[in-house]
Amino acid sequence: MLCFLFFRRFSLLCATGFLGIVLSNWTHDATAADASKTILASGSSSRTAKREAVEAIPLHRLMIAHREAVNECVRSTTLYRRLPVQTVACHPDLLEFSLHHPDSIVDIWRVLNISKLSLDSLGPDQWSFADGYGTVGTFHLIYQEKGLLLFLGRGAYNGSLAPKVLSGTCMLLVRHQPLQGEVGAVHKESLQIDTFLNMDGAGLEFVTRTLQPLIMLSASHNVHEISLFISALSEAARKNPAGVAALANQLDRVNAVEREQLAHIARTIGGDERQARLSLDEVTVNRMNFELASRWISADELEKQGPSPMR
């Protein structure tokens, strides 16, 4: 989602570079502030990067309605940003699951108490989100092929960071590919996200003059932190597949099929189906959950700090 945790607000990813990716809620320790300058510097808003991203969109394969929406977003882009390329140390099955089922990852954050963000399925490849601080919206995975996903979303923000309600459309082009590594090494993939934000007229000037630096920085941090979390989840599954499978069973906001799919992936990563299916005591499960969440400030502490966009 990401060093967004020195940030008060964040939305998804994988979701989620929509309006919500800027103004949503996760939070991080103070060390992120220094790292932010490096992360921001490695992104790009150049015409060359934008042109390459547009050329990578498979327009001829999209449904007509989606093609028109994509063309409109490209024509009327308020803000384009290629986020810094991230390296995700993650089993490929878990990465694919995370990109296609972001609601499951967000529900893990809820169970671990590290985010107030809610993300609910509206149907196949469609979700609604709310952060509890004024950001709401929907997004849709409109196209996917090996190593490429295209998301389109609508979002709105009504809160203390803006003098009026802000609304707009966001498109995310997500590309990932395996990185060459040593034999037997942890599987790694590069993750590149191009974001196109198209603000409705009332918020256009405010975003371009006031929020643009915050949007760029927040989105970059979000992707960085989400990448770190997915890597940590994959490592937890490698070391303790039964614990991650038990965690999957606690995800009350997603359907049983997704819970079992995540549990199966955890057991596959762990490499021992028999051992991974053994029951765990509550203390062991709680310890794993604590270790997985230890990098991030709790959602309860986040609530006390108020809706400031940055720490």
Question: Which ranges hold each PLM region?
Answer:
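N-terminal secretory signal peptides that target proteins for export/translocation
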Residues: 1-7
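Bacterial N-terminal signal peptides
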Residues: 11-25
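Signal peptide processing junction and immediate N-terminal pro/mature segment
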Residues: 24-36
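Hydrophobic ligand-binding cavity/cleft-lining segments
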Residues: 33-123
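Terminal "cap-and-tail" regions of soluble proteins that handle hydrophobic small molecules
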Residues: 35-62, 173-311
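Envelope-exposed proteins and targeting segments
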Residues: 66, 79-84, 91-94, 147-149, ...
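Short solvent-exposed beta->alpha transition segments
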Residues: 105-127, 250-265
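Glycine-rich portal/gate segments that line the openings of hydrophobic small-molecule binding cavities
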Residues: 119-174
